[in-house]
Regions:
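Strand-loop microenvironment adjacent to phosphate/nucleotide-handling motifs in alpha/beta enzyme folds
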Residues: 1-173
Length: 173
């Protein structure tokens, strides 16, 4: 059983998402948060295995709520949105930067073409993400700030000059 929390300020969307999760016996919805702040408090109290986090909510959007969750009570977060007008790649990077594991679109209604397949993929994503181990974020800097294998981001590293005979040796000359 995968206990999860839904964070969505729309009663209709929260009920719809709850019905999707309840349709799969592997999920159990622990509760619904109506704001980002409420989501953070509910995660601390309920300790779900996964959070389905809406982007646009009062009391802190899904990104700020995800940051707070990852700083206090790390748990896998999947950010979802029905707003498909924005660039999906941009939203995905914002979700990852906040600490979410992924960003996906909310499934369309049951009359949409491919509805069953879309819901199956949606639920499969949550099942996979619920098993991911997450840790508390203690440093908010960029990757360029972190040392890697003893080489700092400021080290003047230079690749060696290529072998002039390489192309001929590999038959690509």
């Amino acid at each position: 059983m995968i206990p999860g929390l839904i964070a969505d300020d729309s009663p209709f969307a929260a009920q719809y998402l709850g019905a999707l999760f309840s349709s799969d016996p592997e999920f159990r919805v622990l509760g619904v948060a109506r704001s980002g702040t409420e989501a953070v408090h509910m995660v601390q109290g309920l300790r779900p295995d996964i959070v389905c986090m809406d982007v646009n909510m009062p009391g802190g959007d899904g990104y700020s709520a995800t940051r707070a969750i990852m700083a206090s009570t790390p748990v896998p977060v999947v950010i979802v949105s029905s707003d498909t007008d924005q660039d999906h790649v941009t939203l995905s990077f914002k979700a990852l930067e906040a600490g979410a594991l992924t960003f996906i679109a909310k499934p369309p209604g049951p009359t949409s073409p491919g509805y069953a397949r879309t819901v199956k993929n949606f639920l499969a994503t949550f099942k996979a993400m619920a098993g991911v181990k997450v840790i508390r974020r203690t440093h908010a800097g960029s990757l360029a700030d972190a040392p890697y294998a003893g080489i700092s981001a400021t080290t003047n590293f230079r690749f060696p000059d290529p072998d002039p005979n390489f192309a001929a040796q590999t038959g690509n000359g």
